[in-house]
A protein has these predicted regions:
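Short, low-complexity N-terminal intrinsically disordered segments enriched in polar/charged residues
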Residues: 1-34
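A solvent-exposed, acidic/Ser-Thr-rich amphipathic alpha-helical stretch
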Residues: 24-84
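Short, highly charged low-complexity linear segments
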Residues: 12-14, 70-77, 112-115
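Exposed beta-sheet edge and beta->alpha loop/turn motif
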Residues: 82-115
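General structural signal for alpha-helix termini and helix-helix connectors
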Residues: 14, 37-40, 97
Length: 115
């Protein structure tokens, strides 16, 4: 297998859907108990107890200047899997509005997923 399967992509898609809609129901079951998130908003590193809740609150604040977010995923890069753990980089194109002005952002997300 060279790509994440649909079970691996489901939480990624739900996370992106939360980011686009701020609908908390999309976050159910998305985050692992042992969680680390690196972000572009303070405090930039979210880990340990309460990381998911702190990231959510930070993102909601960050998203106040964003609108009409649409993610587009490319083919996964650097996919590897061992036992119940998988790693991959997911090229992502975000488009939408920032402070009312159209933007496009090209980047990538790195994921380590465990079953």
């Amino acid at each position: 297998m060279n790509e994440p399967d649909e079970d691996m992509m489901a939480p990624v898609r739900r996370l992106a859907r939360f980011m686009a809609t701020l609908d908390d129901s999309n976050l159910e079951g998305v985050f692992a108990e042992d969680l680390t998130i690196v972000e572009n908003f303070a405090p930039f590193l979210f880990r340990g107890d309460g990381a998911a809740q702190a990231w959510r609150a930070g993102f909601v604040e960050h998203a106040k200047t964003l609108g009409e977010l649409v993610p587009e995923f490319g083919s996964a890069q650097d996919f590897s899997r061992e036992d119940q753990t998988a790693y991959f980089v997911l090229p992502t194109r975000w488009s939408g509005k920032s402070r009312g002005r159209p933007f496009t952002e090209l980047g990538g997300w790195s994921f380590i997923l465990t079953r």
